[in-house]
Amino acid sequence: MRRSKTRRIFHVSITLLLVSTIFCQNGTKPHNNSTSDQMSSSWSNRSQTMYSNASSLLSDLLLDYDIRLRPGFGGDALLLTMDIIIASFDSISEVDMDYTLTMYLHQYWTDERLRWSNEIPIDEMTLSGEFSQNIWVPDTFLANDKHSYLHEVTERNKMLRINVDGKVAYGMRLTSTLSCSMNLRNFPLDSQNCTVEIESYGYTTSEVLMKWNYPLAVHGVEQADVPQFTITGFHTEDSIVSTATGSYQRLSLVFQLRRSVGYFIFQTYLPCVLIVMLSWVSFWINHEATSARVALGITTVLTMTTISTGVRQSLPRISYVKSIDIYLVMCFVFVFAALLEYAAVNYSYWGRERGKGGGGNEWPVNGANKEDRESAVNVQKWVPSGLMDGVPQPQDRRVEALEEAMSTSNTAAQNNNFESTSKPKKRSSSPIPPLCRAGNTISEESESPDYPRYSTTSLKGARPHASLNHKTHHLKGRSSARAKRRMTLARMNVSMKQSISGIGRRARKVIPTIRVRDVNLIDKYSRVVFPVCFIVFNLFYWSYYMMVPS
């Protein structure tokens, strides 16, 4: 009985415990909901309080704030520290002497007017960039800037952060094109130093002191990739710049850049080498193939000129000589020398052939004016053609024969006039009837080496014609004067040719004549000399410019 009673009591107690537990759980749910509502309500009230506190705090901070005055006005100089984060190197231009850089610029200073009490539960406030218009900010600028702009996607990339102790952090993201004075004497095997120069525009060193935020003054340089360059290092500098308005603090970030020559090897150097080697092909072409060798030489020369023009257009117009100019000029010299080599071969070959054939060119007698040219025609009418052929020749024998012929002609004319008074003349009135024909053509008898014989027979009983004799005398006198002037010109040409011949003989005595028996030897030697000289030039060129300090 006792056991059964004890079991009943145990079961009843267990049942009551379970029922009480269930009721307790059901009773706590409404209590938890009310607690969460109370917490959310408290957070909302607290947030509203903080918003109101922050708004009132900013209003209180700006209540008596004068943005025209720097922090610590009238006291010690304001310490302004800054750091830079490099986002990217966009481009570098040798023509414009500048480079484009995207960076984050952060500036830090302390403004006592922006402090607030520690009792306010706000330790730091991050504000938009527009708030910077309500407080004093440094008048920082980039001294070597050409063109800069702030990014505005999706909002204006400016940031302002204020701490409880009055410390201000002011940051912005900008892209700037900065000038970079380059020394291109070793281009494209050169190294350059490009800088970012930061300076205060209006505040002197007595009002604002600028310092780098060491040890983390510059970030992101190792991850930056520069087109056609390799960043070998960087360092920061600070200096004081004195101008007419005072002394200003300047912070400089110097990038040490070395140009990558791979682009120029494939763009300039390798084509030049191939063109020079192409010019050597003419040494294996027969020297009688004039059109082929000349066309090849001219093509290589024009190609080198085109490459040189393209390189000059990608560089600024500077007065000093660059290393790439030396290489292009030497390649042009090698190509042009290959063309001159064929000129030497051609001259040697055809000069020898002409020497074997003999003969030479005769010098023409140049008339001084129109009157002299007319006198030459008149002389040909009255002087035998064999003698006239000798006038333009440089030999003294023919000139003397011409003079003797003219004197004989004058004597014959006088005899003919004397005989005409007693004997009748023939039909022809010319004093030299056997030598002339109709149409002013010279008789073939004039080619005889003997002097001409004039006829003295005339018709008996015929009366002389005075008018004809008068015209004949006048014509012969004028022709004789012109013939003498013509002979004077012939003597001048003879003396000129003799003088030039004498100079040539003296020059040949002084300068030894190089005679090549086989013109193919010039091509054979050129096949070796040209490549060897070009290889030696390249060894000296690359050894010097790869080792010389830029």
From Swiss-Prot:
Compartment list: Postsynaptic cell membrane; Cell membrane
Pfam families, alphabetized: Neur_chan_LBD, Neur_chan_memb
Residues with glycosylation annotation: N26, N32, N33, N45, N53, N193
Compositionally biased tracts (Polar residues): 406-421
Disordered: annotated segments: 405-465
GO cellular component, one term: synapse
UniProt keyword terms in alphabetical order: Cell membrane, Chloride, Chloride channel, Disulfide bond, Glycoprotein, Ion channel, Ion transport, Ligand-gated ion channel, Membrane, Postsynaptic cell membrane, Receptor, Signal, Synapse, Transmembrane, Transmembrane helix, Transport
Signal peptide coordinates: 1-24
Stretches of the chain found on the membrane's Extracellular side: 25-264
Predominant localisation class: membrane
Keyword tRNA-binding assigned: no
Family as reported in the entry's similarity comment: Belongs to the ligand-gated ion channel (TC 1.A.9) family. Gamma-aminobutyric acid receptor (TC 1.A.9.5) subfamily.
Protein name: Gamma-aminobutyric acid receptor subunit beta
Annotated organism of origin: Caenorhabditis elegans
Record lineage: Eukaryota, Metazoa, Ecdysozoa, Nematoda, Chromadorea
Gene: gab-1
